[in-house]
A protein has these predicted regions:
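Conserved active-site-proximal phosphate/metal-binding subdomains
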Residues: 145-149, 153-172, 178-334
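Conserved acidic functional residues
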Residues: 121, 175-176
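Active-site entrance/lid segments in N-terminal catalytic domains of soluble metabolic enzymes
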Residues: 1-170
Length: 334
């Protein structure tokens, strides 16, 4: 039987926060979950002590449904196995696993077999069907999305096509959703909830660099481009970013343009790096990868994550009056 996202995850608002690497730390994920939606930690390449530290903060910050996102194609099967093992061993069952891109079936089976909810983001019909067959909540990404693109279809077209094939699956629309009106369009196309990424880049709890946040708020969809230039650390995947001097001239030398700190360790940032500028990044921020979707035109300024959740609460399926009250109560506590 078809369930809304709220029913599938045991949350009050049918909304997922994207587990954006570098940007979505424990503070953002917990704030979203405490507001009644489902927050998500950007696990990205974290493993070992660094991942354990982030998981401890995540679990300490909320006892509600909250996720950890990993990227199979970036880390490879062995590292992904280590990451999944840590989450299963070190967190309670309300922590769900989110995967960006369709992994091997064995990975899905391991997660669901452990009694954890699985969320898989896809960009093609084939992967959407595979994810649903594995019992996953299926995040349907359109090319309107910021960040790395998993397919070539527009959001609502892909949602509608998958809904026709998967009448009982829980489908979550992603890409270009910056307003309740846009969320309503996605629901009308057949979605059971929505995922927001760019909208949470500018959340007060986000770890995005202030320059990045300001640039998103000052932009509209014409300021974004789909490119493949930010390929160091994640090659072979097109991505939507804010246009920069680097996207306009990709023949510049691959020299270091900044530094950043991840879980206490300092790293240099080369030009064309896939890494986003965070609050710990210094250097030529304006040349770095600032992932941004077509929703930016509806985003006007930094605000608490709870305010973002509250804005969408009344329009999303499965939320209802109870969900709205919960969001307002949570906001009052922040």
């Amino acid at each position: 039987m078809r369930a809304t996202l709220a029913e599938a995850l045991g949350i009050r608002v049918s909304l997922l926060q994207s587990g954006m690497g570098g940007v979505a730390g424990p503070d953002l994920a917990c704030a979203v979950s405490e507001a009644g939606a489902a927050g998500c930690l950007g696990g990205y390449k974290l493993v070992g002590e660094a991942l354990s530290a982030a998981l401890k903060r995540l679990v300490a910050g909320t006892d509600r449904a909250v996720g950890v996102n990993f990227i199979p194609e970036v880390v490879g099967p062995e590292e992904l196995d280590r990451q999944v093992t840590q989450v299963l061993d070190e967190t309670p069952r309300q922590v769900y696993l989110s995967l960006f891109g369709m992994p091997d079936d064995a990975v899905c089976e391991r997660i669901t077999g452990a009694g954890r909810q699985l969320v898989v983001q896809i960009g093609t019909v084939r992967d959407g069907v595979r994810a649903a067959e594995q019992g996953a909540i299926v995040v349907v990404q359109g090319t309107e999305a910021g960040g790395h693109l998993l397919g070539t279809s527009h959001r609502d077209e892909l949602v509608a096509e998958l809904r026709a094939l998967l009448p009982d699956a829980c489908l979550v629309a992603a890409g270009g959703i910056g307003s309740p009106a846009e969320a309503a369009r996605a629901v009308a196309a057949g979605a059971d909830g929505v995922l927001l990424g760019t909208a949470f880049v500018v959340a007060r709890e986000s770890m995005a660099h202030p320059y990045f946040k300001t640039a998103v708020c000052a932009s509209d969809e014409a300021d974004t481009v789909i490119t493949d230039v930010y390929e160091i650390g994640w090659s072979g995947r097109r991505h939507r970013v804010l246009a920069t001097a680097v996207t306009r001239d990709c023949d510049q030398p691959k020299k270091f343009i900044g530094r950043t700190v991840v879980e206490g360790k300092q790293y240099v940032v080369p030009r064309f790096s896939a890494a986003v500028p965070t609050v710990t990044t210094s250097g030529r921020i304006e040349e770095m990868a600032m992932y941004c979707g077509l929703s930016c035109g509806a985003i006007s300024g930094e605000r608490p994550a709870a305010d973002i959740v509250a804005e969408f609460a009344r329009i999303l399926p499965g939320s209802g009056t109870v969900g709205t009250e919960n969001v307002e109560e949570s906001h009052g506590k922040l």
